[in-house]
Amino acid sequence: MAGLPLVGDEFAGYRVRAVLGRGGMSVVYQAENLRLSSVIALKVLAPELASDDVFRARFLEESRIAASLNHPNVIPIYDMGSHDELLYIAMRYVSGTDMRQMIKKRGRILPATALFLIGQAARALDAAHRKGLVHRDVK
């Protein structure tokens, strides 16, 4: 089984440009779709997860369901699959920062802003739940 891709590598038709984030289960990259010359976010799961047949089947099924979601608060999925025995999801790249970085940079946010942002996240989770998906890593 191959290791995770490195910046500059070609992976499943995508050229890895930068690492956007790392977690216990995956690495998210900024990548270029080589067929369309478009920028995407590429999430590649840890190699040890791809070797677990139960996890692999669940991942592929949940990815198909997630790709069917059409909601303004849900990032669209463009592609998913397996490459060099690693599981991946290609999705819309959204530039900017996450909530943790925003608070770190700006300090506390106003309660009205927090409610607005939490409301958007809740609507996205509700759309997923209606399709039978449960997000396992809400922070």
Task: Indicate where each model-derived feature is located.
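Conserved ATP-binding/catalytic core of the eukaryotic-like protein kinase fold
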Residues: 1-139
